[in-house]
Amino acid sequence: MAVTEQDTQVPTLRKIVTSESEPLARRFRALFSLKHLASLQPPTEQTVPAIEAIAAAFSSPSALLKHELAYCLGQSGHDAAIAPLRGVLEDKDEDSMCRHEAAEALGALSDKGSLELLKKMRDDANEVDVVRETCDIAVDRIEWEHGLQKGTEKLKKSDFTSVDPAPPMPESNEAPSIPALEKTLLDTTLPLFQRYRAMFALRDLSSPPDLPTAVPAVHALARGFGDPSALFRHEIAFVFGQLSHPASIPSLTEALSNTKEASMVRHEAAEALGSLGDEEGVEETLKKFLNDPEQVVRDSVIVALDMAEFEKNGEVEYAIVPQAQAIAA
């Protein structure tokens, strides 16, 4: 039987994403190609091999790559991703940024079977903050997903296809109030899950960028960079990366430039700026951090500059075109 292009697709991408000799930017493009194949609905015969290929790259020393692997597995919507994600979360020797992303991914998969593990880590006083906080949000998300509340809430249709750590605030009969959402966003006495709901509601009011609510909502989100939680600040940067709104550039630049800021926040700010690569001055800003003392920031800048190049070239998808010949080139 002849080997088809489809048969060689996942193995070729797996070889790239797991190879330490491949440039990081190329490995990321291979990863996003695998994410596409892993997330196809309905699943295909490539779904599980693509998930296994993504999980195989957890042996990499790159914290940036591993955290992105976990994110992509969480977006797959497939139970085959659960076991490798639990393995990363339970590995106390793993980078906390990767473990946090694994916990968030289990929440995105709405895996009830992981609730016991997530609750145990949420309640462990010796666990690092970023993992504890993520487990807290993931538990609330899974319980919301499987609870009665979800069915009774009216949610605004989002422009974004991502499976988020929390749904946006439910719609009411009144017009959404940016000051009210900002108040919830910044209230540290509220559960993180509730504050994240305000965050994603503000995100959805920022897109498309010409909405009259967009700039005020972006400015409200930017005030979240003053929060005491590094996890929360990093999620603000992630949302800005999704939005690619020019009004976020000053706060993202400030976050990246602050060498006292947590590396998980700075790296996310760098990647968000990469999505704004066609805006004036952004590439120059990123290039200043190519030799940053923090490896995850350096790596993020490399990927961000590759993304910026992609934005300028008007390429359709930040991925290697999933065709065997193109991949092997």
From Swiss-Prot:
Pathway: Protein modification; eIF5A hypusination. It is an enzyme of class 1 (oxidoreductase). Its main location: cytoplasm. HEAT-like PBS-type repeats lie at residues 65-91, 99-124, 232-258, 265-292. It catalyses: [eIF5A protein]-deoxyhypusine + AH2 + O2 = [eIF5A protein]-hypusine + A + H2O. It is found in: Cytoplasm; Nucleus. Fe cation 1 binds at residues 67-68, 100-101. Keywords: Cytoplasm, Hypusine biosynthesis, Iron, Metal-binding, Monooxygenase, Nucleus, Oxidoreductase, Repeat. Its cofactor is Fe(2+). InterPro entries: ARM-like, ARM-type_fold, Deoxyhypusine_hydroxylase, PBS_lyase_HEAT. GO terms for molecular function: deoxyhypusine monooxygenase activity; metal ion binding. Fe cation 2 binds at residues 234-235, 267-268. Gene3D superfamilies: Leucine-rich Repeat Variant. Its EC number is 1.14.99.29. One of its GO terms (cellular component) is cytoplasm. Binds 2 Fe(2+) ions per subunit. Belongs to the deoxyhypusine hydroxylase family. PANTHER family: DEOXYHYPUSINE HYDROXYLASE, PBS LYASE HEAT-LIKE PROTEIN. Catalyzes the hydroxylation of the N(6)-(4-aminobutyl)-L-lysine intermediate to form hypusine, an essential post-translational modification only found in mature eIF-5A factor. This is Deoxyhypusine hydroxylase. It comes from Phaeosphaeria nodorum (strain SN15 / ATCC MYA-4574 / FGSC 10173) (Glume blotch fungus).
